[in-house]
Amino acid sequence: MAKSQRDLKGWQYFLDDAELNNTDSVNGEPTTPSRRSRRGKSTSSQKISLKREEDELEIKEGDFLLVQQDNNSPEVAIVKEIKFGNDNFLDIIVSWFIRMRDIEEADLPKVEEYKERSQLNENELFITSYLDEVKLGEIIDKVNILSEEEFNNDIVIDDSNKASTFICRRGCDSAGELFTDVFDFRDLCVLFEKNHHEFIEFIRRKTVPVAYNANKTHDKSKSIKDKLDEVETKKPKQKTVSKQILDEEEENNDSSDEFESAIDLQDEPSSDELESDEDASESKNKSPRKRKASSKPKAVKEKQKRVKIPNNHSKFDDESRQFITSVVSPLNKRMKIKDSSKPSILALSPRKPKKGVSKGENGKNGSLGVDASSEAFKELKEKLHTSTRLSSLPCREDEFTSIYLNLETAIQEQTGCCLYVSGTPGVGKTATVREVIAQLRELTEMGELNDFDYLEINGLKLLSPNVAYEKLWEKISGLKVTASNAALLLESYFSQDTPRKPLIVLMDELDQIVTKKQNVMYNFFNWPTYSNSKLIVIAVANTMDLPERVLSNKISSRLGLRRIQFIGYTFEQLGSIIKHRLDMLTKQNKRKVIINSDAIGFASRKVASVSGDARRALTICRRAVEIAEKDFLSSKEDPGNEQEIENESYHVQISHISKAINETVNSPISQFLMSLPFASKLVLAGVLLRMKRSGLAENSLGDIIDEMKNSLTMLTSRDGDKVLEAIDSKMTLIDLLYGNGLLQNLDSTFNSKDTNIRILRFKYIVNELVENGILQQNVRGERHSLINLNISEEEIVSVLKRDKEISSIL
């Protein structure tokens, strides 16, 4: 990349084998370039080559280069295109290779040549479809990349060629997690010579998971030979440049249509780069500027849409309908959730975290121009996200072992059982169970454990508790029936002695499945007791004593005594969890952005003192990194500090953690809760106490009213007793809130026993909380209406505990 002709000092560039030196032969000063006319010829057919004057190194499209960016380790890339740009005088677009040393051993294909780390070839490269810009000063030298046959037959690796000779036989995605089958790299080079856009498109379709596409299976199965034949077939259909210009006015729609089709095949179709990429159009049609001058731009868009529609309309409609049905139906077992850690084909360019290579310095778009520090901040935020996949679960070894042994024993003995897992939100209950299932799956694949089925039912995702019957029967039979029929079929199925695999059912958010008759819970805990059921139920809830307080004796007795409690994380454990995620960073990014140990300890202690919720600790740290990134970018804007900042590490300090915590404390919801009167806070305290006492997320309004009055009666703290001392030494909070008004309470004839059942203006208080989104109310009759929180319980607790009067109740 050269921003101007001045940056080409020491280099020469050539167009169509005609030397166009960019320096004056006498003075060595840059000369004014002549205007590049687009009228006589198409610039898309011009190929640019470069020559370094120092060592006469020549670079052209298709060359393999050794590139070093920002003092990082040198990496290998193939030159996809050299072109004149809009923002820069010259753009050098490359596609990166990933070295074997940058691939995690666990991510390598499960084949014989990658079985042991000691047998891996350190000179093996993996081609990716990730595109990037490089600067002329970052180019070190050319390298040789050979196919597997050439490498094994003709090459001996020694110190003389170890750094310049490589082998490539597979491609992979930018994260080094998804790999292609073995191919002949020489055939891939032939495809590049014929059409470098099809070359990138071929790698991209083989390595990047696609979103829904009716023809995706067909595209995945294409080999390099098929793609070469396809390119050869397309060649005769292309028009010559002169023919396109002559026919521009008469056949405007057709040529525009061809250009739009070519754009669809390009790997960087961002709207802000269409004009800059006009010279690299695959079909070599007229420039986009000519197309913009067309008198019928709308017709072009309509034609583009028609080109993308498959010929087999009925098949396309059926597949679309099947796809939509599988997504919108919560009961379809074939519904798959896409993994967030894998890039999508819809992205303009996938990320490349494992290469440790800077993406440039412009910062003008997401695929090109992200410096190393920004990439470090980005990866750090990804690792601190709660959805990040972990290789292990720290600080939950004992609970993991208990669940693992119970499930393994039940599977081996082919018996049913119930397991109750309890703990506050964010302590790793569901994650631990899923990790146990994953470990058991690996044992099954290795043949060391009997095969089993697994089903996860989340109470919050069910329209009603009875839907659990439908999901379980669908897992067993693959058929959808009504809940009532499913219950009958399940009862008959588990009663019969038929060959079946053990079935593990994870019932998450158990308190949401509780009904008045409790028949759903009874059946799910009763079926494992059948001798031939082989049903293993794992019930997960937030409170340990929920079976005794909520479920009847006949249900709690069937649940059994296999109970595992997850206690809240201590501040040492939270610190270990955060450090475990920081260890997942690449070595380069670890040096660029550092979270101080004091900052980790501060965040851990703050969260551990409230709830021990690991999700909250990670969220605070992630927000602190965002605040630190903002400070970094603002300091980078100072021209004097830019070079110094780029070469130094940036630290996330306690001040950043403190700001992140203050944001949660001073959020709009927190400020609204702080402004509420005592009576409204008392209602919220009653909701929290009732939830704690019952273990249920939803509680009746009548129970909350009783909880409020009982709490005030039992209030014995100094602040609670003397809060009304200035008005009347004998007046209590019950007299004030449950009387008919302050003036009547001050009347000497008022009897404290003559109080109302509810506090004054109670209906107005509840409606205010509902309208502001704090509570949700299911109106089924006033006293029997169900109330549940609409915001985080932790946020309400943190606000109420800062209130002297109300904190005594909690």
UniProtKB/Swiss-Prot annotation:
GO cellular component terms, A-Z: nuclear origin of replication recognition complex
Any one GO molecular function term: chromatin binding
Subcellular location field: Nucleus
InterPro entries according to UniProt: AAA+_ATPase, AAA_lid_10, ATPase_AAA_core, BAH_dom, BAH_sf, ORC1/CDC6, ORC1_wHTH, P-loop_NTPase
Residues binding Mg(2+): 508-509
Compositionally biased spans, kind Acidic residues: 247-280
Polar residues composition-biased segments: 21-30
Annotated function: Component of the origin recognition complex (ORC) that binds origins of replication. It has a role in both chromosomal replication and mating type transcriptional silencing. Binds to the ARS consensus sequence (ACS) of origins of replication in an ATP-dependent manner.
The protein's name in its UniProt record: Origin recognition complex subunit 1
Species whose genome carries this gene: Debaryomyces hansenii (strain ATCC 36239 / CBS 767 / BCRC 21394 / JCM 1990 / NBRC 0083 / IGC 2968)
